[in-house]
Amino acid sequence: MLSRALLCLALAWAARVGADALEEEDNVLVLKKSNFAEALAAHNYLLVEFYAPWCGHCKALAPEYAKAAAKLKAEGSEIRLAKVDATEESDLAQQYGVRGYPTIKFFKNGDTASPKEYTAGREADDIVNWLKKRTGPAATTLSDTAAAESLVDSSEVTVIGFFKDAGSDSAKQFLLAAEAVDDIPFGITSNSDVFSKYQLDKDGVVLFKKFDEGRNNFEGEITKEKLLDFIKHNQLPLVIEFTEQTAPKIFGGEIKTHILLFLPKSVSDYDGKLSNFKKAAEGFKGKILFIFIDSDHTDNQRILEFFGLKKEECPAVRLITLEEEMTKYKPESDELTAEKITQFCHHFLEGKIKPHLMSQELPEDWDKQPVKVLVGKNFEEVAFDEKKNVFVEFYAPWCGHCKQLAPIWDKLGETYKDHENIVIAKMDSTANEVEAVKVHSFPTLKFFPASADRTVIDYNGERTLDGFKKFLESGGQDGAGDNDDLDLEEALEPDMEEDDDQKAVKDEL
């Protein structure tokens, strides 16, 4: 009787284990509300991606995420990677404040109250390095040459501090710098064999990288600030290709002036043009980020639109400052020699280049419909007409919110088509720019009241016909306020278009 009872108990336990076992896909745990707490209890360090099956960014991340999971598992690490389909597990998504996809959070020791937001890049090395920084020392102690070689081989970029006295002030400054950098592995050594292997005979810091010149030796007084500046100048390739994976490094970096080479990989002298661009980059490390964009790639077409370029106009070079204004600049010459690109960059840094403002040609029928069509060339004349109250939608053709607004805006135009001093208008801000208005989100709605003082009023009320009418009838008061929707920096990210069924949830970085 006892053995039979034990058998039943064993079968019941096996059934329970089978039901609660954590499913895996490509070494990534698949979590649901029913097993989320179990996963947190089982793993002290858990990185969780909240994703949507339709999300382009999530699809692009998947292979790198799996690669990171496999690498950590192969190393015998305590850290595990997991994923949650937020469209199926809406309670979990709401609990952890998921507003866009992918949202990635790091849970340490089962703490659900304050998980850490993942902030690094989207390549496997970025993920692994960020996690190791969160779970171990800021810098790994390298006791022999094998440990040093292993660290250098482990990532695209590594930094090693060589200090004969690990307790010196310089070593302490190095460790402070290591704590401040999330996405690069650091090592520290006092071992004489490691010094010899890397040709150092005194204290120093070396940045190792698997591209360009291979290594950079720090020179000067070792302080946290100077080390961070040294790393900023040398951690990225001279020329970085814009992709789904590199976008966080490009936008998240400290260098906010970017020069972009739009170059189809199929062009006959591809290597030569890229070589010229790279040669020019050598003189602007830490000042201007040099970015290459494959103009033939489908995912990059929106970036071309943003710069007012067509595929047939490439190769081409443009420069942009990613400050609040997001100002664009165009070279004086179409020649893509290293000398011309270098000259263009120098002229920009010296303040000798005027911003490049795009404009479409003015359509012949621009004023024939209830909603007037504005382009760069007629904007000033129409918007700042002293006798007219002009309400303008600044839109992007691909923007989901703009598409939803379109029929309402058309009705508004119909409502006021015969009004003597109210004009309803629209402007495609991906193809037209004006000095008087800087558009930072889509759609942006601005009111230009009839006056001589060039007043501009932002609209941020309800996007309904009644809301717009109240705003206009109140002279631009009822509904006035700052506008904040789809940020233009997101417009530069690949695969950002929203599907109708996405409920306007942004596919965020």
UniProtKB/Swiss-Prot annotation:
All copies of the Thioredoxin domain together span 20-136, 335-477
Q: Which domain of life is it from?
A: Eukaryota
Q: Name the site position(s) for Lowers pKa of C-terminal Cys of second active site.
A: R463
Positions where N6-succinyllysine occurs in the chain: K224, K273
Q: Tell me which UniProt keywords the record has, alphabetically.
A: Acetylation, Cell membrane, Chaperone, Disulfide bond, Endoplasmic reticulum, Isomerase, Membrane, Phosphoprotein, Redox-active center, Repeat, Signal
Q: Which Gene3D superfamilies match?
A: Glutaredoxin
Give the chief site where it resides.
Answer: endoplasmic reticulum
EC class name: isomerase
Q: Which residues carry this modification: N6-acetyllysine?
A: K202
Q: Quote the subcellular location field of this record.
A: Endoplasmic reticulum; Endoplasmic reticulum lumen; Melanosome; Cell membrane
Give residue numbers for the modification (Phosphoserine). S333, S359, S429
Q: Which GO terms describe its cellular component?
A: cytoskeleton; cytosol; endoplasmic reticulum; endoplasmic reticulum chaperone complex; endoplasmic reticulum lumen; endoplasmic reticulum-Golgi intermediate compartment; external side of plasma membrane; lamellipodium
Cystine connections: C55-C58, C399-C402
InterPro entries named among the record's database cross-references:
PDI_thioredoxin-like_dom, Prot_disulphide_isomerase, Thioredoxin-like_sf, Thioredoxin_CS, Thioredoxin_domain
GO biological process terms held by the UniProt record: cellular response to hypoxia; cellular response to interleukin-7; endoplasmic reticulum to Golgi vesicle-mediated transport; insulin processing; positive regulation of cell adhesion; positive regulation of substrate adhesion-dependent cell spreading; positive regulation of T cell migration; positive regulation of viral entry into host cell
Please indicate which residues carry the site annotation Lowers pKa of C-terminal Cys of first active site.
Answer: R122
What residues form the catalytic site here? C55, C58, C399, C402
The record lists the membrane-crossing segments as none
Site annotation (Contributes to redox potential value): which residues? G56, H57, G400, H401
UniProt motif Prevents secretion from ER: location: 506-509
Family per record: Belongs to the protein disulfide isomerase family.
Protein's name in the database: Protein disulfide-isomerase
State the species of origin.
Rattus norvegicus (Rat)
Q: Which gene encodes it?
A: P4hb
